[in-house]
């Protein structure tokens, strides 16, 4: 992994932890993906954000093959299809807030916009 890839993987984890802290996610629910090279980096399936390391984030290539020590989020296809169809989007955030489902924008939360 390059320094830049490690940085992006860590940013994904930080964003997941922030979602949990703000009550937008609980436990292992929800996931984040970021466009990376010819595919995407995405949170793994069934792994708690607490204690997650950069190496735990899964890369899914353009042929939908996952690379990593874990399986990608069970909703990886949802993320993959959005990123494939909408080139102007470089990240997908899927959350499960305690008091409803919705889309939340954070002006102070920075996810990478370009790999």
Protein language model annotation of sequence segments:
Residues 94-98, 108:
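Histidine-centered divalent metal-coordination motifs
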Residues 102-103:
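Helix-adjacent hinge/juxtasegments
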Residues 107-113:
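Conserved small/polar residues in nucleotide/adenosyl-binding loops
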Residues 40, 113-114:
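A very general structural signal that marks isolated residues within well-ordered alpha-helical segments
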Residues 47, 98-99:
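Short acidic/polar capping segments at secondary-structure boundaries
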Residues 1-4:
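Basic/polar N-terminal segments that are highly enriched at the extreme N-terminus
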Residues 6-93:
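An anion-binding catalytic pocket shared by soluble metabolic enzymes
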